[in-house]
């Protein structure tokens, strides 16, 4: 069974596809890198403002940012 779970696997995958580091994402969201890293690990959940901004930055028009990746589904 995989340790990938919302939002970690999808958020990391989208960020890397866009070529952003955690530091760059944090800067764009005006939060600390640690806070952003906590979103990816699932230790913290982003507020609505940051969810909307992440979707804009990552080019996600729907709520795919919050769905598990295909790898996560197949590993369950």
Residue ranges with predicted function:
Residues 11, 25-26, 36-39, 65:
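Conserved hydrophobic/aromatic packing and binding residues within compact polymer-binding modules
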Residues 43-55:
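Short, basic-rich loop-to-helix N-cap that marks the start of a DNA-contacting helix
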């Amino acid at each position: 069974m995989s340790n990938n779970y919302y939002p970690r696997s999808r958020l990391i995958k989208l960020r890397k596809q866009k070529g952003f580091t955690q530091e760059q994402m944090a800067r764009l969201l005006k939060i600390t890198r640690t806070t952003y890293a906590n979103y990816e690990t699932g230790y913290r959940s982003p507020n609505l403002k940051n969810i909307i901004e992440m979707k804009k930055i990552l080019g996600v028009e729907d709520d795919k940012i919050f769905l598990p990746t295909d790898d996560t589904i197949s590993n369950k």
